Swiss-Prot record:
One of its GO terms (cellular component) is cytoplasm. It comes from Colwellia psychrerythraea (strain 34H / ATCC BAA-681). This is Regulator of ribonuclease activity B. Gene3D superfamilies: RraB-like. It is found in: Cytoplasm. GO terms for molecular function: endoribonuclease inhibitor activity; enzyme binding. Its main location: cytoplasm. Belongs to the RraB family. The lineage of its organism: Bacteria, Pseudomonadati, Pseudomonadota, Gammaproteobacteria, Alteromonadales. The gene is rraB.
Length: 116
């Protein structure tokens, strides 16, 4: 059985890819996919980044941000290059979601850029 939160990320994936294609992004080129990870605990986030690095994933520099309520949160992205294939990105999303869960940090979805 698929986790309810993961199912929401799958729905997000389907919607985002459909919107990108509708807007005319080039579906014949690779897109940079940025998977977002966050935690209020920097040590946990750092351990997640190290775990991802050991898996051979491209880790972007961690950043500190302030939430609307004033709380601080730390975040980093894992960047991949993928075609806009729903099944492929769902599989990647599931792997990222599970990595976040194993490391005790939040998976905050993914984003990409419009490609000409």
């Amino acid at each position: 059985m698929i986790d309810e939160e993961l199912q929401q990320w799958f729905s997000h994936t389907e919607m985002l890819i459909a919107e990108l294609l509708e807007d005319g992004t080039n579906d014949e080129v690779y897109h940079t996919i940025e998977h977002h990870f966050a935690s209020s605990d920097f040590d946990l986030l750092e351990k997640a980044a190290i775990a991802a690095f050991k898996l051979g994933l491209e880790i972007e520099e961690p950043e500190e941000a302030e939430l609307e309520n004033g709380d601080k949160v730390f975040a980093f992205d894992i960047a991949t290059e993928q075609m806009l294939d729903v099944n492929l990105i769902k599989k990647e999303t599931q792997a990222m979601f599970e990595l976040a869960k194993q490391c005790g940090v939040d998976y905050d979805g993914w984003g990409t850029y419009f490609e000409e």
